[in-house]
C-alpha cells in the first residue's frame, strides 16, 4: 500500500516535509489521513479534512445501535428507514411515533394494492426483528449483523451504483469502522476512541508539518522532491460527474499541474481493488518525458 511504500523509505522529518500526496477531490483525503494517523506519520493539508467518523454511514450505525437498545428516536428511525432499501416511501412512515404499531398501520393502509401493502408490512416486521437482534450487542457484533442479516453492505454497493460512485469509496468507511470496532469491547470504549480520533486529526492539521496532502488544484505554486498522485483511473482523473467529463482540457491541465509539482520523484497510483481503466492521461505523460522534467523519476503503480 501507499503507507507501506512511505514507511519502507524510512524518511526523516525533512524528507516528510519534501513529500506530497495529491488527489483530484478532497474526499480522498479522508482515507489517506486515516492511514497516516494509524501509522503516526506526520502530515498537514492545504484545506480542511473531514474526519471519517463525520460520515452518514457511521451515523447510520449509531442509529441502529440506539434503536436496538431501545433509546432511538424518530430521527434515528427516519435515517435508517430505507438503509437498506425497504421501499417505505409514503410520507406517513416519517410522521409516526416510531412504534411498530403505527408503522404497521401505515403499511397496511397503503393505497398501492394488496401485494405492496403485504410487502411493506413484511419490511417493517423484518426491520424490528433486526432491532431485536442488535439488542445489547458489541460494536463488532452489531456491524456483523448489519452486514449479514441487515444487508447493509449490499445496500452500500447499490447506493454507490445509483450515485455513479465506486463502491470502494463507501466500503472504505465500512471496513474501517469494522476494523476499529474489533479493537473495542463496548460502545463506551469505541465512543472514546472516536472522540480521540477527531482530536488527533485536528491537532495534526494544526501543526502544519510533515507530508503535504492536497488536491491537484490546491497544489498550484507548490513543489516537493517526492510526489504521489492517487487514484489515477478513468472517471477520477479526468474527473467525471455522472459519467461525463465536463472539461477535458481543464482536467488534463490539472493533472499536469500535479505532475510538475515533483522535483525528483513522481509516483502515479490507483486504489487497491479498483477495476477501472488507468487514466488516459498517464499514457500521454509517459509518451513525453519532458512533461515532468528531464530529471524527474516517473513511476506508475497500478495499485496502492
Residue ranges and their predicted role:
Residues 55-56, 71-72, 137, 164-168, ...:
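Structural motif
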Residues 59-81, 213, 243-246, 260-261:
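Conserved RecA-like P-loop NTPase helicase motor core
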Residues 29, 55-58, 74, 90, ...:
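Amphipathic alpha-helical transducer elements in NTP-driven molecular machines
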Residues 226, 233-304:
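Accessory/regulatory regions of helicases
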Residues 75-107, 113-116:
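Helix-hairpin-helix
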Residues 1-71, 211, 222-224, 230:
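Conserved motor-region signature of P-loop NTPase helicases/translocases
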